[in-house]
Amino acid sequence: MSQTLLVVHVQVQVKPEGIEAFRAATLENARASVGEPGVARFDVVQAADDPTRFVLVEVYRDAGSPAAHKQTAHYQKWRESVEELMAAPRTSTRFVNVFPDDRGW
């Protein structure tokens, strides 16, 4: 079977004083994101050794779904609310799914 899922890791460094506000805004966005038809999974993880570092693991059903995600009201709200909380610009890396098979998501 052809693999079509797109996995995006978004790396975020937050100001220490913004950790709780970032977590709250990001969890609200994640909960809404998993309801999008193009989103297979949306995980939020925080570094065990540095609470200011987060990774958002976003799994999209196809290459067009990230653009659709960025048009949603909840994403727009998230982006605006966390902008001042960032210690540095966020970065991202795109991956193609290898395992499990797309049907396993």
Where in this protein do the model-derived segments appear?
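N-terminal first-folded block
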Residues: 6-36, 40, 44
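Short, well-ordered beta-strand segments in beta-rich or mixed alpha/beta enzyme
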Residues: 6-13, 43-70
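Non-catalytic surface loops within mature trypsin-like serine protease
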Residues: 14-16, 62, 96-98
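An amphipathic, aromatic/His-enriched active-site/gating alpha helix that lines ligand/cofactor pockets
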Residues: 27-40, 59-93
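Short alpha-helical
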Residues: 17, 28, 51, 73, ...
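Glycine-rich beta-strand-turn "strand-cap" elements at beta-sheet edges
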Residues: 1-6, 44-52, 80-105
